[in-house]
């Protein structure tokens, strides 16, 4: 049963991940620019979802790598969560999280069109999961985690706006809901892991003289990695 569950999650992740390069390319623009509507040769995007889903051959993230990454993320979540209701939530949110990481890594931007729906979806879907027998979390904990992590990052943004952006705080809303589902220890572990990974990356750049103190780094991928680690811990302990 577990092997089939993990295999199914991996197949879902691979299929969903194969559709992410196109939106990653289209959304990977500076804040003052519109979303891309054509490839570098000027050909308008066509295909599923009005050209928003699909590969981005020669002008975006490589499809095999993105599909593999998403498959591994989904498989790991299935292996640790098991056949519990919240696994459906994690598998639905995982491709969006991967997409956010791709965009932020590319242009240091976390678009509202992704972060806010992610937070809303996490809240609603976990509320539904809480109604299904066999779950291992708390919807109240998810709401508290959402407010705690989102509010915490908002404070960090206000203290150091050059180091983090409002996009990080908006992303933290959805991640806080997911981590808070498993309770305060997992919420704290995921939050600290994300901050720690970002700090280590920044320190490494300074040591290698590849960045200065004022250099902006994309925190989104590290926040996502921290939340992913927290969910693995929560799944194992649930």
Where are these regions (language model features)?
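A membrane-topology feature that recognizes alpha-helical transmembrane segments
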Residues: 1-238
